[in-house]
Amino acid sequence: MIPVVALVGRPNVGKSTLFNRLTRTRDALVADFPGLTRDRKYCRAEWEGHEFIVIDTGGIDGTEEGVETRMAGQSLVAIEEADIVLFMVDGRAGLMAADKGIARHLRSREKTTVIVANKTDGIDADSAVGDFYSLGMGEIVPIAASHGRGINSLLEQVLLPLVSDGLAEAEDEFAPWPDDEAEVLAREEEEEPFDPQSLPIKLAIVGRPNVGKSTLTNRILGEERVVVYDMPGTTRDSIYIPMVRDEREYVLIDTAGVRKRGKVTETVEKFSVIKTLQAIEDANVVLLVIDAREGISDQDLSLLGFILNSGRSLVIAVNKWDGLSSETRDEVKEALDHRLGFIDFARVHFISALHGSGVGNLFESVNEAYQCATKRVSTALLTRIMRMAVDEHQPPLVRGRRVKPKYAHAGGYNPPIVVIHGTQVKDLPDTYKRYLMNYFRRSLGIMGTPIRIQFNEGANPFAGRRNTLTPTQLRKRKRLMSHIKKNK
């Protein structure tokens, strides 16, 4: 599960500066939902190949007595969502009453916390952080966020414990890309057959507040299904609900909390950005619910962007379709085509969760998307498709030389990854890369999931090697050099 890091502290201690430094941007909201997330910013960040989510909470400007009340708002939610809290203080201003109040609250929540003393550039850091040890929260990490000093050591201390388990698993599973097609084929023969269809499909239902996620979830659970049991999820408040439909096992990831089975009336749903993002990360297929009466919003596009970046399969459900006039429906479809043209691989369903129309068809697209995302494809087939694509449309010249793709093999699944080996393949223009991606998609019949193309250039075995000249070649070279010197 992707780690979550929350930044908390008084105003003007540098939380936003550190947020921008970690995310390498100055305006990178994953989502900004009115009301519930107005005072919190979320962004996906990466360090040394490790991904994590950063939450910037707005300053807590209450007094020592009032800070407990202040923390009950947006910052409290961020702290509960986080795996680790970076408690930021001002190294120049020293220890303040509000810092003590925040520290008391953090201790009461028993959250893993690291005190980060900012603005320590140009001063004696050891002396500046001395007062903060009285908070009794362990070691203090001095940084200068505006200049980027101390950021790497901070991330080492914060992230490495969170990703250590993931690193061990990755090392066990990692195998370098072979440079030889025969080696790939031999490795495929050695692999034990694995059937992803034997596993339950993890389906996350996500969307903005009040689009009908609650109603759709209850409709799914109340329609011709066998609910095995309700199992609280390991990711904070999300609920994992194993269920069976048409003899196929699913795990429904419910981000809207526990609701009574019989209650299908629409209510205002408590919405957590982190719960939604983590549900997307943990799912095989994401069902994005859109309100037909409100159309596509910027928040919907933000969620779509996160889903695509995560490489998850996608099915779109346009809810509240009942009651719309034919003219309004045509306008909605036109708007969808205009704003969602970049994800033409996803199936779009028009449903009414309240009345159940169109809900049953969703699972056909969910199963299709999962099958396409986990389909095993041989190296021979991928190489044949690649050569057909090259024959139909030759790669352009790069620095006067023709790019030569040699062979292709599968580099991963969910999403499908095709690795193309060859000379200068990394220099292909984006237009040709998109052509290859679309060609593979059409040839393999992939729907409902993004597909990624990666390029690998084998090392030149003759690089740096100099041929030994024969005696005849040495005499010829000597005469040539003598001739050149005479003509100068």
Swiss-Prot record:
PROSITE patterns named in the record: G_ENGA
GO molecular function, one term: ribosome binding
InterPro entries for this protein: G_ENGA, GTP-bd, GTPase_Der, KH_dom-like, KH_dom-like_a/b, P-loop_NTPase, Small_GTP-bd
Biological process, per Gene Ontology: ribosome biogenesis
Keywords (A to Z) from UniProt: GTP-binding, Nucleotide-binding, Repeat, Ribosome biogenesis
Domain KH-like: 375-459
All copies of domain EngA-type G, residue ranges: 3-166, 201-374
Amino acids binding GTP 1: 9-16, 56-60, 118-121
UniProt: GTP 2 binding residues: 207-214, 254-258, 319-322
HAMAP family: GTPase_Der
Known function: GTPase that plays an essential role in the late steps of ribosome biogenesis.
Family: Belongs to the TRAFAC class TrmE-Era-EngA-EngB-Septin-like GTPase superfamily. EngA (Der) GTPase family.
PANTHER family: GTPASE DER
Quaternary context: Associates with the 50S ribosomal subunit.
Name this protein carries in UniProt: GTPase Der
Organism the protein comes from: Sodalis glossinidius (strain morsitans)
Taxonomic classification: Bacteria, Pseudomonadati, Pseudomonadota, Gammaproteobacteria, Enterobacterales
Gene label: der
